A protein has these predicted regions:
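Walker B catalytic acidic pair
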Residues: 300, 306-307, 318
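Short beta-strand elements
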Residues: 18-24, 283, 387-390
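P-loop NTPase nucleotide-binding/switch module
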Residues: 170-209, 213, 240-295
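Basic, amphipathic alpha-helical bundle interface domains used for macromolecular binding and assembly
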Residues: 33-44, 59, 66-76, 290, ...
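Peripheral, non-AAA+ core regions of ATP-driven protein-machinery
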Residues: 1-218, 222-225, 331, 471-472, ...
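The Walker A (P-loop) glycine that initiates the GxxxxGKT/S ATP-binding motif of P-loop NTPases
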Residues: 221, 285, 307
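Walker A/P-loop
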Residues: 219-260, 325
Length: 519
């Protein structure tokens, strides 16, 4: 008897409907076609055990299985459930008239318990697009899948629950998630606040500008100056995620299996802080079965690289293209996977190997050669891609003890949102551009053209600091953001002046100045 059930194969963020065909006739052979990987083929043993524990027998017959389309590689254990239901139906052990109305995904434990799978949300989106009545998933995946409207989602504990649902022996209610209510309730809840930061007003201003324009930023200062503390509070002043951004971000985390149990939608911008020992593959994504890396998990959020020079130099260099393109393409011999990675890159580093250059409370013990080797770990092209570069000095104890609580994140966030609203209106006719940091060169000339006084100031800065052409464009982008924060339609000389101040770590000035002083 030939039976068909339906499942899905996830390739990056793309999902393909898979028809699971099972034909059982007298005989003793077991065959599987359709490019299933090891996890798919091993499903036979899991299915046999799950059926036996729940009172069914794995058929002793000639079983032929095909996973169509046969030329598409199928990976993972999510095919256990559709295979088990197809085998039960083809053998006559169960009868269901609605089997073809549902898409099924789930890994089976040996006792028949359904284990969570990766990619439940994009699978649910595909199921709705294919006009399936419903989707059956493991209980742990039900809330992320139930985000999709106009699709019945059933979260099941074990295979017996699935059998009872599909045979009509019991009636189950589909899972319902009030997506909008949960999304907006959690959107503005932050555990960290800029009010906790005493002093460092100039750095907080730089972070405000970065948040307002979506700019990358690096902070350089001695240990204990507050670099990590401020970076971790950046999400609290960023504009809230839109529902479409939240859905896109949640899909990436779903495919990576990073969603917390019970989570329906990610309602706050991600903050990822990988350790400096991270590999290239873990950072940008890849592997035998390509998975999203940290840069994609930070999509629509923040990627924080603490102690930047401690990262492997080659690992840092692979960031250059994603920072420009806002996507990462992973190529294999027979297919290509693309993950989005539009994130704010925030980095911190010490000013020298010992960490105490320019610290009034500690003496720097580094030689010029040590400083040069330390600085060479960060290439000029990578530094050029960081719009805002600022130095931090420690806050003296007397200032920490006397200072009033800093400005709360909510107040800063209001200004950031107003600036972003200006940018949204400005770029409404430009596809893929939402903030100043994403402006193309032509758009810079259109929206951030400096006046004569600003051009003279820029010329002086370019010559004095040996700035690159890319740095010139970065200055204009940042100046446009500062003007938006001021509510100014034009980029004026004071905006250019502040933006130039955020390029004080460029190679032509900062590294050489340190070597001269160290001597």
């Amino acid at each position: 008897m030939l039976v068909k059930t339906y499942s899905a194969a996830v390739n990056g963020l793309d999902v393909t409907t898979v028809t699971v065909e099972v034909n059982i006739v007298p005989g003793v052979m077991y065959r599987m076609t359709g490019l299933g990987d090891t996890a798919v083929r091993e499903g036979r043993d899991r299915i046999a055990s799950a059926l036996q524990v729940n009172g069914y027998k794995f058929p002793h017959a000639d079983i032929t299985i095909n996973l169509a389309p046969a030329d598409l590689r199928k990976e993972g254990s999510s095919f256990d459930l559709p295979l088990a239901m197809a085998i039960l139906t083809a053998s006559g052990a169960v009868t269901s008239d609605v089997l073809a109305d549902y898409m099924l995904v789930g890994e089976l434990s040996l006792d028949g318990t359904l284990q969570p799978v990766k990619g439940a949300l994009p699978i649910a989106i595909r199921a709705r697009a294919e006009k399936f009545k419903g989707l059956i998933v493991p209980k742990q995946n039900e809330r992320e899948a139930a985000v999709v409207n106009n699709l019945e989602v059933y979260g099941m504990e074990n295979i017996m629950d699935v059998i009872k649902l599909l045979t009509g022996r019991e009636v189950y209610e589909p899972t319902f998630v009030d997506t909008r209510r949960e999304f907006y309730e959690q959107q503005s809840r932050f555990d960290l606040d800029f009010a906790d930061v005493r002093g460092q007003e100039s750095v907080k201003r730089a972070l405000e500008v970065a948040a307002a324009g979506g700019h990358n930023l690096i902070m350089v200062g001695p240990p204990g100056s507050g670099k990590s503390m401020m970076a971790k509070r950046l999400p609290s002043i960023l504009p809230p995620l839109s529902l479409s951004e939240s859905l896109e971000t949640t899909q990436i985390h779903s495919v990576a299996g990073k969603l917390k149990r019970g989570t329906s939608l990610i309602s706050q911008r991600p903050f990822r802080s990988p350790h400096h020992t991270i590999s290239e593959v873990a950072l940008v994504g890849g592997g035998i079965n390509p998975q999203p890396g940290e840069i994609s998990l930070a999509h629509n959020g923040v990627l924080f690289a603490d102690e930047l020079p401690e990262f492997n130099k080659q690992t840092l260099e692979v960031l250059r293209q994603p920072l420009e393109d806002h996507k990462i393409t992973i190529s294999r011999s027979k297919y290509t996977v693309e993950f989005p990675c539009s994130f704010m890159f925030i980095a911190s580093m010490n000013p020298c190997p010992c960490g105490y250059y320019n610290d009034p409370t500690h003496k720097c013990c580094c030689t010029p050669g040590q400083i040069q080797r330390y600085m060479s770990k960060i290439s000029g092209p990578l530094l050029d891609r960081i719009d805002i570069q600022c130095e931090i000095t420690p806050v003296p104890f007397k200032d920490i003890s006397k200072a009033q609580p800093g400005e709360p994140s909510a107040a800063i966030r209001e200004r950031v949102i107003k600036a972003r609203d200006i940018q949204t209106a400005r770029y409404k006719d430009f596809k893929g551009v939402h903030c100043n940091a994403q402006m193309t060169e032509r758009m810079i000339h259109q929206f951030a053209e400096p006046d004569e006084a600003s051009i003279a100031l820029l010329r002086t800065a370019m010559e004095k600091f040996s700035l690159s052409a890319r740095a010139y464009n970065r200055i204009l982008k940042v100046a446009r953001t500062i003007a938006d924060l001021d509510g100014s339609q034009r980029v004026e000389v004071q905006h250019i002046s502040e933006a130039i101040g955020y390029r004080n770590l460029d190679r032509g000035d900062w590294a050489e100045r340190r070597l001269v002083i160290a001597k």
